């Protein structure tokens, strides 16, 4: 069963690689992920609380003070 699963996943990856030109799929996936993350959660405004996994609108978190910059 494991061998069949590995062969199936390999075939899927080869099919996907042939469908998209080199580099195009990677950038499309990043844009899609970025868009989905912005839709599902808002960003934390300046001086808002942040931590190890910050979601600051500016993408900068002062880790010592735990506030968005």
Swiss-Prot record:
Its subcellular locations are: Secreted
Spans traversing the lipid bilayer: none
Primary location group? secreted
Disulfide bonding pattern of the chain: 43-57, 50-61, 56-68
Q: Offer an example of a GO molecular function term for this protein.
A: ion channel inhibitor activity
Q: Which residues form the signal peptide?
A: 1-17
Cite the record's tissue specificity text: Expressed by the venom duct.
UniProt keywords, alphabetically: Disulfide bond, Knottin, Secreted, Signal, Toxin
Q: Name one GO cellular component term.
A: extracellular region
Cited InterPro entries: Conotoxin
List the Pfam families hit by this protein, alphabetically. Answer: Conotoxin
What residues make up the propeptide removed on maturation?
Answer: 18-40
Can you quote the domain comment? The presence of a 'disulfide through disulfide knot' structurally defines this protein as a knottin. The cysteine framework is VI/VII (C-C-CC-C-C).
Q: Which family does it belong to?
A: Belongs to the conotoxin O1 superfamily.
From the Swiss-Prot or TrEMBL record, give the protein name.
Conotoxin LvVID
């Amino acid at each position: 069963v494991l061998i069949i699963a590995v062969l199936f996943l390999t075939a899927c990856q080869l099919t996907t690689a042939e469908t998209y030109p080199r580099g195009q799929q990677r950038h499309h996936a990043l844009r899609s992920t970025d868009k989905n993350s912005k839709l599902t959660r808002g960003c934390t405004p300046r001086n808002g609380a942040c931590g190890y996994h910050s979601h600051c609108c500016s993408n900068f978190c002062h880790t010592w003070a735990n506030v968005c910059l």
